[in-house]
Amino acid sequence: MKTIGITGGVGAGKSTVLAYLEEKYNAFVIQADEVGHIVMAPGQECYQPVIDLFGKDVIKNDKTIDRKRVSDVVFEQPDFLSCLNGIIHPAVKRYILKSLEEQKKEGRKLCVVEAALFLEEHYQEFCDEVWYLSLIHI
């Protein structure tokens, strides 16, 4: 199985490339940002640690984490960001690695991982290629 990592700036066309690879080559596409939402859902790995860090005020009526409230706290108190990242990023990486392993077992030929902090989180360690997309204005 080949794994391609994709990263790049805002508006560089990442979503377009992901959709193309998924449609044209039947690629399994996994986006770190979406995984971040999954691991913070009720009953998932990061749910309770995030509540422990930010307090019960971040729980909405439907029991999900109020991401806006979390971002407000992080904006006002930047020290919380490194703590939050220490909870979320390792869980996202584990989830992605598990998903890639499952796809390999199912015989998938191509997987694509997209992440904003691709290099910072060392995702290149489990990718065969890394594509950095950028948009050049002329």
Cite the ranges covered by each PLM segment.
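P-loop (Walker A) phosphate-binding loop of NTP-binding proteins
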Residues: 9
